UniProtKB/Swiss-Prot annotation:
Catalytic activity, EC: 7.1.1.-
Protein name, as recorded: NADH-quinone oxidoreductase subunit K
Family membership: Belongs to the complex I subunit 4L family.
Binding partners and assembly: NDH-1 is composed of 14 different subunits. Subunits NuoA, H, J, K, L, M, N constitute the membrane sector of the complex.
Length: 101
């Protein structure tokens, strides 16, 4: 049977993979956004696991809020990336960093 520890280990592995993805690839903005989304999904998995283990629905409510914020963040982030790519013809973090005033 799959217990709480299995879900927590899986959530920790997903979180660690996303942290490694952020630290190893700091050039491409799309990969950074995907790593942040993976991090949020790992947190959601832990919330769901604890919610099921404790028989409390508060964790599931938090997951809905996190998914809503993550969807809005993805939509806004991708819209900004499309505008930057149209203007600069690149999505490299170093080139976008040169936009500072």
């Amino acid at each position: 049977m799959v217990g709480l520890s299995h879900y927590l280990i899986l959530g920790s592995l997903l979180f660690a993979i996303s942290v490694v993805g952020i630290f190893l690839n700091r050039k491409n903005v799309i990969v950074l956004l995907m790593a942040i989304e993976l991090m949020l999904l790992a947190v959601n998995l832990n919330f769901i696991a604890f919610s099921h283990y404790l028989q409390d629905t508060a964790g599931q409510v938090f997951v809905f809020f996190i998914l809503t914020v993550a969807a809005a963040e993805s939509a806004i982030g991708l819209a900004i990336l499309v505008v930057l790519f149209r203007n600069l013809k690149t999505i490299n973090v170093d080139d976008i960093n040169s936009l500072k005033g």
